């Protein structure tokens, strides 16, 4: 069947058709099977047989084979060239977007408060005003109040309703607050007689005059109307101003000054001895008679010493306090009115509180600087001291208003019922007054003299000289003899010129040859043994006696202020005439006292006049002193006798050796035979500060109200408030008995770094002996309260005596500098201390854009000032050198502290920075009471603060009190808006605590302008220029502000033009900085520096992160650079505040204590070491100016703590810390972290040995057999080699201090970062490596690097792992590639875009960086380039490093532009060859700029109008041809610098910019790559010379907050390791 026949016709029958179809289908299948079988069995085999029978012959000659081989090589070349060698082109990732600005809390999602237990403080306030909430917000000014105290005040709460336009006098002792409505506060104008009710009529178009009243403030709902000082007077009714001597001594003083009526100041002292009444008349302070009108009748004549007369004086002097409105006519006016010109007082009581003050036309101006010698107040009507000055203050309702008032009777009752709580309220009020009113008047209102007149008056008031017998009996000669031999011993080593001086020896026949040293008087470096007495001695019984005769003092030579002339008339027992007239004595004064080196000294004396502040061992190399970071004063003095513990605990306070001194154990037979100078000095200080209070008829009232101790008698060492191992000088070996100062003082010493005052609103809680005992905080010791002060005083004095130091200061030494925290109180034994107001330059605070007047000093006030007594006591203070000599000519002398006076009284007790400089006018011997000891006195004896409050009440001018009444203390919650853009500018603000951010919104984008930290001012420019708000300001965290009304500023400016001058300086500085930013090309809208960071939260991403270890190392790094730091974790806070610290009842306690920590430390670290949902973790986040998110780099996903951080909606700046075990980062690993966290502002890589990051399981990949065999062979070879290498211990190399990562973070927190900018210049940039080596040799840390062109290449290599050797090696490899002519020729192409393809250039850069990202670099790095698509400069901080380094090095014409997401990038030098602005925007203050592109060749070039390249080419071989034509590369290079020359000039003029031009201009841009070693050597030499020059000139940046303290960190650390066991 060869073929299938045609099927028959079915004739229309379907069945037949179907059968035919089936049959034919089977036939077709069978036919296909036949065909397939025949093909497989016959067709294919036959075809194969035929193919094998054919034969093919190919014949190729050599040319053909050569061409074929060349073609194969060419194909292989193109395959490798464009497939293998261009793999770098595949490394393309777009740069990460810039970090999102901190969003406002209102933009975030609602807070899940139910799940986290967080109240959303940023929710909109309800329209329903809660009466109680407004009242509570008002009384928060008093700090934390216990329940009984709060209930006591609430019982007396009253309300007053005022209709719109109604007035109310509020100048009494009541406490007023606005519950609802708005009230205007008016004060009577001293220049016109005021009517009782102010009206709104204006008499002048320039100044609103409300019928003789000033508008001070406008208070809305929740604000307070009362001045705090009007309330202080209620608590100080029974306090006397000064110590009163015995009646016999009074009579002696009266006889002494009987014939000297012109000495008004002296008579005032006599009257103050006769009475505790404040003599507030102008005669007591020397006011010139300006008008024949009679003086107020309270100015009395010299009265007798009888008690009735004292009572009359006490009652009659009230009116003078309020009716004498003092006149301002100068700084210090001389005394001119004799006492006899006054009239005797009339024995009448004071007027009622509601009466208006009578204004005398003769004394209607503001107070004079010299008119502040005030004394005490009456016993009953004491409220009129503070209120008299404020009397007549009127509140007028602008709308229907409801006021809440606590009457004066409530505070009186509170004083008697809860004396301890009253003392706490006084302390809070004083603290707020010093931090708010004093700071505002001093820094912003230019009223420093108004405060200084109070200080000068206080100085006169607290003068209590030593007994005259001390001076007449040879005590001063003996004191000098004790100091002098030690100075001569040192002089024999250091001062060879004085070695042979005959006057340098002290006569052996001095007082101390006969009188042995008291065992409790341990002067510095005294001999260990003192001979027995050979002659009669002075007994201690003469301590309290007053001299019967006086030594009249001659004025000092030189300029003395008018006050000095007045004070010369004050009797002083402290000046030795021998010291003033004897040349030998003057020589002894001038000799520097330096601690001798003795073979008996086995360790450092704790009080060796602080010679050891230099941290250098003595000449024998045996001892040195290591001060702690916050030491406020001097150490405990001893004579190195073997009576202390042999172990020297370096963690203890330098004021103690860890064991108290027992006077009974040393020379008991001589105890009563020697004059105890320390005890005498301490007694005088105790009288001056009010620690001694005499018992009178109302002693029981005093004991109940003011002398009650502030520590409960229930305190026991077993209390939870006792931290373990809290060895203090007050406990020592007697731990079993209760300490003298109670458990709170142990808490103060619980940490060696905690020397601050436990104050603020938390004082009450810190004193709880049992945190769960609610009544313990307001209880008191019955024995102490009823038994008077004698026993308590004796115990306190016995303990405090050990802390008194006797110091010698050379003439010209600076004891305290303006703007620094006072180290303590100085009692002048002999000599004079001068208080002067330093000249404030308007350019002194231009450095910090956020700085306010005086804030520049404040940065160093936390560290350096505490150690100043150590240096200045020996004249070794380096800070007084040339700067002091130049500035002393401009300083304005204010007053002189004479023997018996106290310097630093106000600043020490108020815990404020000093407003003046205190210098030694002559060689001085002073008694020094350290600041921490004063704090303990304050804690134990509130009478000291009450006395200060009483004195301030009587001495402060009405202007300061009116300012205090007008200032408003305001509190903002986190996220709350202070004011919005477009609001009316009615007030400006000062930040007390917290942080705020200013921003503007444009096109739905938020642009952060700046951030405000502690002591920064907000909005004053808008107020002065009378424009609407130009920005929106909101609180980053809970913040405390001072609101200064514009009305107050206007009122003060009229009377005090210096206030306007002060503000004009402030505004001029702001405008000047703004113009400077504009001239320097600063990009608008970018945030300014944020150096003023106070609180830092250390938050781990997960529970496994070692935040405690990280924070501990960070704290040590902060203190090593000189920044005092408070370390707070949950355990420390609970030990201080009790177990209820984080409960709702303890919220105010925690807030007050944390605010106090911020006030006393440069930086506060909040360590979140508790579970995520705990209250402490939430507190850490809420309190932070900056949040450091610490992670170990194991999992880039968000951790539980980070989720909590986002849920709290905090708007604080957030930065990421990635911990690594070694100094290397896996390429690309950082990008995953940053991409998941767009809210991170910046990140840091930190090396923390011991961090174990578990390796992720890698999916198994089956290698080919050949690769597996090769790996097996490699392992075998490595195993065999290890046998011959031996066992070596694994030692991790210790990083040098300038490469410490924790120090880098610390410098960032303190705003002390050092940046490095490396400029472009082709091959000349090889010299950058030499500069880097010079920086390492000088130990200069580098915290950030920026580069342009070749500078980005070298800087990027160094920033990668900070390895100088690797940087030099890879740069040399790149130079070899660029110097190879063959590589350049192989890359040449048709010059349409450029002469080369750029491939070889790309390969050279890629071989140096490979696939590393910029964010993987160990040090923050950026490179700049020029975007020719959009004609702008680009700054690259993320992305593949090789690409953006290549973009920054793209020289147009030689290389094609780099395409990055459609943008064409070329060399950054076309825009800015030394880009410093990106570093400035990151808050880096000191920037070292290395410029290698400067072209100094400006010689004229003349070569005609046309140039033949061939002619120049052939003339290259002509030795006599001088080429004057620039090559293309040189022209292109110069073209780069033409565009950036203006920017370079701005860089040179930028403050904080250290510019160096490398002398490498003789090298070509490309040809210099062949001379690598030569260029690098030139850079190293130039770098060394420049850094050495800067160091000699004092311009070398070190990154230290405190130069003196931080420079010794390395030496201290090394020596401690060598001397440890």
Swiss-Prot record:
Task: Cite the EC number.
Answer: 3.1.1.5
Q: Where do the TM regions start and end?
A: 13-33, 60-80
Q: How is its activity regulated?
A: Inhibited by organophosphorus esters.
The residue ranges of the PNPLA domain are 1316-1480
Predominant localisation class? endoplasmic reticulum
Where, subcellularly, is it found? Answer: Endoplasmic reticulum membrane
What CDD domains does the record point to?
CAP_ED, Pat_Fungal_NTE1
Can you tell me which residues form the catalytic site? 1349, 1467
Ordered alphabetically, the record's keywords are: Endoplasmic reticulum, Hydrolase, Lipid degradation, Lipid metabolism, Membrane, Repeat, Transmembrane, Transmembrane helix
List the ranges whose topology is Cytoplasmic. 1-12, 81-1621
List the Pfam families: cNMP_binding, NTE_Ploop, Patatin
Chain location of the short sequence motif DGA/G per the record: 1467-1469
In terms of InterPro entries, this protein maps to:
Acyl_Trfase/lysoPLipase, cNMP-bd_dom, cNMP-bd_dom_sf, LysoPLipase_patatin_CS, NTE, NTE1_P-loop_dom, PNPLA_dom, RmlC-like_jellyroll
Q: Where is this region: Disordered?
A: 188-209, 250-379, 545-566, 648-667, 711-735, 772-791, 839-870
Catalytic activity entry? a 1-acyl-sn-glycero-3-phosphocholine + H2O = sn-glycerol 3-phosphocholine + a fatty acid + H(+)
- Lipid metabolism listed as a keyword: yes
Give start-end positions of Low complexity composition bias. 195-209, 348-361
SS bonds (residue pairs): none
Task: Give a GO biological-process term.
Answer: lipid catabolic process
Which residues does the annotation say bind a nucleoside 3',5'-cyclic phosphate 2? Answer: 951-1070
Query: Which function does this protein serve?
Result: Intracellular phospholipase B that catalyzes the double deacylation of phosphatidylcholine (PC) to glycerophosphocholine (GroPCho). Plays an important role in membrane lipid homeostasis. Responsible for the rapid PC turnover in response to inositol, elevated temperatures, or when choline is present in the growth medium.
- Give the UniProt family note: Belongs to the NTE family.
- Protein name, entry field: Lysophospholipase NTE1
Q: What species does this protein belong to? A: Cryptococcus neoformans var. neoformans serotype D (strain JEC21 / ATCC MYA-565) (Filobasidiella neoformans)
């Amino acid at each position: 069947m060869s073929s299938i026949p045609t099927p028959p016709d079915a004739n229309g029958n379907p069945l037949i058709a179907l059968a035919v179809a089936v049959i034919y289908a089977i036939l077709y299948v069978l036919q296909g099977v036949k065909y397939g079988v025949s093909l497989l069995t016959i067709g294919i085999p036959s075809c194969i047989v035929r193919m094998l029978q054919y034969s093919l012959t190919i014949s190729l000659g050599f040319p053909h084979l050569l061409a074929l081989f060349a073609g194969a090589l060419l194909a292989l070349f193109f395959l490798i060239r464009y497939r293998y060698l261009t793999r770098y082109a595949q490394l393309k990732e777009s740069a990460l977007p810039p970090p999102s600005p901190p969003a406002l809390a209102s933009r975030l999602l609602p807070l899940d408060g139910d799940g986290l237990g967080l109240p959303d403080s940023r929710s909109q306030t309800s329209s329903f005003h809660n009466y109680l909430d407004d009242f509570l917000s008002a009384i928060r000014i008093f700090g934390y109040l216990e329940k009984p105290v709060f209930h006591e005040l609430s019982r007396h709460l009253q309300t007053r309703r005022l209709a719109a336009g109604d007035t109310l006098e509020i100048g009494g002792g009541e406490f007023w607050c606005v519950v609802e409505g708005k009230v205007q506060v008016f004060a009577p104008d001293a220049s016109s007689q005021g009517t009782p009710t102010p009206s709104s009529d204006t008499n002048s178009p320039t100044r609103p005059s409300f019928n003789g009243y000033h508008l001070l403030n406008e208070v809305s709902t929740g604000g307070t109307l009362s001045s705090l000082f009007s309330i202080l007077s209620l608590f100080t009714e029974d306090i006397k101003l000064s110590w009163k001597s015995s009646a016999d001594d009074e009579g002696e003083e009266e006889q002494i000054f009987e014939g000297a009526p012109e000495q008004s100041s002296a008579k005032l002292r006599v009257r103050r001895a006769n009475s505790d009444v404040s003599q507030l008349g102008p005669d007591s302070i020397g006011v010139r008679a300006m008008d024949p009108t009679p003086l107020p009748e309270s100015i009395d004549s010299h009265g007798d010493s009888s008690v009735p007369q004292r009572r009359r004086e006490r009652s009659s002097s009230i009116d003078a306090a309020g009716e004498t409105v003092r006149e301002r006519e100068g700084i210090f006016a001389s005394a001119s009115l004799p006492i006899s010109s006054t009239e005797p007082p009339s024995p009448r009581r004071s007027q009622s509180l509601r009466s208006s003050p009578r204004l005398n036309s003769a004394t209607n101006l503001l107070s004079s600087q010299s008119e502040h010698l005030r004394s005490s107040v009456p016993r009953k009507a004491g409220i009129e001291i503070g209120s008299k000055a404020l009397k007549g203050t009127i509140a007028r309702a602008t709308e229907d208003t409801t006021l809440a008032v606590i009457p004066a009777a409530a505070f009186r009752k509170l004083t008697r019922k809860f004396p301890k709580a009253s003392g706490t309220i006084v302390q809070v009020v004083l603290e707020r007054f010093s931090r708010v009113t004093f700071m505002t008047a001093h820094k912003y209102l230019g009223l420093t003299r108004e405060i200084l007149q109070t200080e000068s008056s206080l100085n006169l008031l607290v003068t209590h000289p030593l007994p005259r017998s001390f001076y007449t009996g040879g005590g001063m000669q003996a004191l000098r003899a004790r100091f002098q031999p030690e100075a001569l011993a040192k002089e024999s080593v250091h001062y060879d010129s004085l070695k042979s001086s005959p006057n340098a020896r002290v006569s052996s026949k001095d007082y101390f040859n006969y009188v042995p040293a008291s065992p409790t008087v341990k002067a510095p470096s005294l001999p260990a043994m003192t001979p027995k007495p050979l002659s009669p001695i002075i007994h201690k019984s003469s301590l309290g006696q007053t001299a019967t005769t006086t030594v009249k003092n001659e004025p000092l030579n030189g300029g003395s202020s008018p006050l000095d002339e007045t004070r010369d008339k004050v009797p002083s027992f402290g000046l030795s005439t021998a010291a003033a007239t004897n040349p030998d004595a003057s020589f002894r004064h001038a000799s520097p006292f330096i601690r001798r080196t003795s073979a008996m000294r086995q360790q450092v004396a704790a009080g060796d006049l602080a010679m050891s502040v230099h941290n250098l061992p003595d000449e024998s190399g045996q001892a040195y002193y290591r001060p702690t970071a916050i030491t406020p004063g001097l150490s405990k003095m001893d004579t190195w006798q073997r009576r202390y513990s042999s172990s020297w605990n370096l963690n203890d306070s330098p004021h103690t050796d860890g064991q108290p001194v027992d006077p009974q154990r040393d020379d008991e037979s001589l105890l009563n035979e020697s004059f105890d100078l320390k005890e005498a000095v301490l007694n005088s200080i105790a009288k001056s500060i009010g620690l001694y209070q005499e018992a009178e008829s109302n002693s029981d009232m005093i004991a109940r109200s003011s002398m009650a101790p502030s520590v409960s008698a229930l305190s026991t060492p077993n209390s939870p408030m006792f931290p373990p191992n809290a060895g203090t000088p007050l406990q020592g070996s007697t731990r079993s008995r209760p300490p003298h100062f109670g458990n709170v003082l142990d808490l103060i010493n619980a940490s060696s770094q905690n020397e601050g005052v436990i104050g603020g609103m938390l004082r009450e809680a810190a004193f709880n002996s049992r945190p769960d005992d609610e009544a313990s905080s307001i209880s008191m010791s019955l024995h102490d309260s009823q038994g008077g002060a004698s026993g308590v005083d004796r115990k306190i004095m016995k303990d405090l005596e050990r802390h008194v130091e006797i110091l010698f200061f050379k003439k010209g030494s600076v004891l305290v500098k303006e703007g620094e925290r006072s180290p303590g109180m100085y009692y002048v034994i002999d000599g004079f201390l001068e208080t002067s107001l330093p000249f404030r330059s308007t350019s002194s605070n231009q450095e910090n854009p956020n700085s306010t007047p005086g804030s520049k000093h404040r940065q160093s006030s936390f560290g350096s000032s505490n150690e100043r007594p150590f240096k200045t006591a020996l004249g070794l203070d380096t800070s007084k050198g040339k700067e002091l000599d130049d500035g002393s000519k401009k300083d304005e002398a204010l007053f002189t502290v004479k023997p018996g006076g106290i310097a630093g009284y106000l600043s020490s007790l108020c815990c404020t920075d000093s407003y003046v400089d205190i210098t030694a006018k002559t060689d001085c011997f002073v008694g020094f009471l350290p600041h921490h000891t004063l704090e303990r006195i304050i804690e134990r004896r509130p009478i000291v603060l009450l006395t200060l409050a009483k004195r301030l009440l009587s001495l402060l001018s009405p202007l300061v009190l009116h300012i205090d009444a007008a200032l408003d203390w305001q509190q903002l919650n986190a996220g709350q808006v202070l004011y919005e853009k477009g609001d009316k500018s009615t007030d400006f603000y000062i930040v007390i605590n917290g942080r705020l951010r200013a921003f503007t919104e444009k096109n739905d984008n938020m642009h952060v302008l700046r951030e405000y930290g502690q002591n920064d001012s907000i909005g004053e420019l808008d107020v002065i220029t009378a424009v609407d708000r130009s920005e929106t300001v909101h609180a980053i965290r809970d913040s405390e502000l001072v609101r200064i009304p514009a009305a107050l500023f206007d009122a003060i400016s009229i009377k005090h033009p210096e206030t306007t001058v002060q503000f004009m300086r402030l505004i001029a500085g702001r405008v000047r900085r703004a113009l400077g930013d504009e001239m320097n090309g600063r990009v608008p809208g970018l945030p300014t520096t944020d150096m003023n960071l106070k609180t830092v939260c250390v938050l781990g991403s997960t529970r496994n992160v070692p935040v405690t270890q990280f924070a501990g190392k960070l704290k040590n790094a902060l203190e090593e650079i000189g920044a005092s730091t408070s370390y707070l974790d949950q355990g420390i806070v609970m030990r201080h505040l009790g177990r209820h610290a984080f409960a709702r009842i303890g919220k105010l306690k925690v807030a007050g204590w944390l605010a106090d920590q911020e006030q006393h430390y440069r930086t506060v670290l909040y360590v979140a070491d508790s579970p995520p949902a705990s209250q402490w973790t939430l507190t850490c986040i809420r309190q932070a100016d900056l949040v450091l998110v610490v992670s170990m780099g194991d999992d880039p996903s968000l951790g539980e703590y980070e989720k909590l951080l986002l849920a709290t909606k905090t708007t604080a700046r957030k930065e990421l810390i990635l911990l690594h075990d070694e100094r290397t980062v896996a390429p690309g690993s950082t990008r995953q972290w940053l991409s998941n966290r767009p809210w991170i502002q910046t990140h840091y890589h930190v090396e923390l040995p011991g961090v174990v990051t578990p390796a992720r399981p890698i999916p198994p990949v089956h290698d080919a057999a050949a690769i597996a065999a090769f790996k097996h062979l490699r392992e075998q070879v490595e195993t065999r080699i290890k046998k011959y290498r031996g066992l070596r211990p694994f030692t991790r190399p210790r990083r040098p201090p300038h490469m410490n990562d924790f120090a880098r973070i610390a410098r960032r927190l303190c705003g002390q970062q050092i940046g490095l900018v490396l400029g472009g210049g082709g091959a000349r940039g090889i010299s950058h490596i030499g500069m880097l080596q010079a920086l390492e040799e000088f130990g200069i840390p580098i915290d950030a690097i920026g580069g342009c062109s070749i500078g980005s290449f070298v800087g990027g290599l160094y920033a990668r792992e900070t390895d100088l050797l690797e940087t030099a090696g890879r740069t040399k490899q790149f130079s070899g590639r660029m110097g190879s002519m063959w590589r350049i020729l192989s890359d040449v192409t048709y010059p349409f875009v450029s002469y080369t393809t750029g491939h070889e250039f790309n390969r050279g850069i890629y071989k140096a960086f490979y696939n590393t990202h910029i964010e993987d670099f160990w040090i923050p790095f950026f490179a700049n380039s020029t975007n020719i698509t959009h004609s702008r400069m680009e700054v690259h901080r993320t992305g593949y490093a090789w690409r953006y380094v290549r973009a920054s090095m793209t020289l147009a014409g030689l290389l094609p532009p780099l395409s990055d997401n459609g943008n064409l990038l070329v060399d950054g030098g076309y825009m800015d060859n030394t880009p410093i602005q990106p570093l400035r925007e990151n808050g880096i203050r000191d920037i070292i700029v290395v410029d290698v592109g400067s072209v100094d060749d400006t010689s004229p070039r003349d070569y005609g109008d046309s140039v033949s390249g061939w002619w120049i080419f052939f003339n290259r071989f002509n030795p006599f041809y001088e080429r004057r034509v620039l090559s293309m590369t040189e022209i292109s290079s110069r073209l780069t610098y033409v565009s950036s020359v203006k920017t370079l000039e701005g860089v040179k003029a930028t403050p904080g910019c250290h510019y160096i031009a490398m002398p490498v201009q003789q090298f070509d841009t490309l040809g210099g790559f062949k001379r690598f070693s030569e260029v690098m050597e030139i850079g190293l030499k130039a770098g060394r010379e420049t850094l050495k020059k800067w160091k000699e000139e004092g311009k070398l940046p070190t990154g230290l907050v405190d130069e003196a303290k931080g420079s010794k960190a390395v030496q201290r650390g090394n020596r401690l390791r060598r001397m440890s066991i």
